[in-house]
Amino acid sequence: MGELWHIKEGTEEEFPGLIGVDGYTDSSIRTIVIESTITDDTDPMAKANLEEYKKVVVRHEIVHAFLYESGLEGNTNEIKNWSQNEEMVDWIAIQFPKILKVFNLLEVL
């Protein structure tokens, strides 16, 4: 990325920015914060594999950080803030392991 970022894990009480989300990126202090209790035992729709889901959340927030470090966080207003589009960021975060596997297989890194 070029700059040192920190990844913290905590609760909504420790990090109010987590209210309603599983993670967020604070570009002003180069910090990624991930919810440490991404589970609700009373929710029948809760994720079964929380460790894998947390990895996706961390990758998602890292994509946001890379977009910020690339100067794209605030410079995409002409195209409806595409760099902050959650679907696009999710796509990169979810597909990256597959893309990396193909790049490694083809030895194109």
Residue ranges and their predicted role:
Residues 65, 69-74, 96-103:
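Amphipathic alpha-helical interaction segments
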Residues 103-109:
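Long, well-structured alpha-helical subdomains associated
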Residues 1-54, 68-69, 78-94, 109:
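Active-site scaffold of zinc-dependent metalloenzymes
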